[in-house]
Amino acid sequence: MQQSEQIVVGRIGAVYGVKGWLKVQSFTDDPESIFEYSPWLLSQKTEREMKVVEWRRHNNGLIARLEGISDRDEAARLTGADICITADELPALADDEFYWRDLIGMRVVNTNGYDMGVVEQIMPTASNDVLVVKANSNDGFGKSERLIPFIQSEYVTAVDKEAKQIQVEWPSDF
């Protein structure tokens, strides 16, 4: 694997059975798409590249057998490991689509030019994602945090990846 930013896409769970199968917790939108990435870089105390030999759905979860792991004891050493891929393995997005990791840390400015702060995290909701913007320490309206719905063309008017800035139609005092 190339030296590139690592993205955690899942975690190895408990051992399943005696033949080296492991439960897999996927963080991908479609849980099964975690198996489209290969090899996985398992990160625990050390890092180790592993290939999935086979996988299947089990009850409401996923289980997998990894190359070179053939018994319960070998599998147990991997429990709790993060499943990582490199950022360049992520699928390309349309111009109006963004990975959360790319939005976090961006400066948010409203259409009046007021610096609202920096995206600290993103909250998923049933209807849309919400930007959690940490306000500047000298915010003129005494805000410490703003919650701004990430709805493009309604509240989010522009995202400039190169300038690391999001422009929003949002009142400065809200």
UniProtKB/Swiss-Prot annotation:
It is found in: Cytoplasm. The PRC barrel domain binds ribosomal protein uS19. Binds ribosomal protein uS19. Residues 95-174 form the PRC barrel domain. InterPro entries: PRC_barrel-like_sf, PRC_RimM, RimM, RimM_N, RimM_N_sf, Transl_B-barrel_sf. One of its GO terms (cellular component) is cytoplasm. An accessory protein needed during the final step in the assembly of 30S ribosomal subunit, possibly for assembly of the head region. Essential for efficient processing of 16S rRNA. May be needed both before and after RbfA during the maturation of 16S rRNA. It has affinity for free ribosomal 30S subunits but not for 70S ribosomes. GO terms for molecular function: ribosome binding. One of its GO terms (biological process) is ribosomal small subunit biogenesis. The keyword Cytoplasm applies. This is Ribosome maturation factor RimM. Belongs to the RimM family. The keyword Cytoplasm applies. Keywords: Chaperone, Cytoplasm, Ribosome biogenesis, rRNA processing.
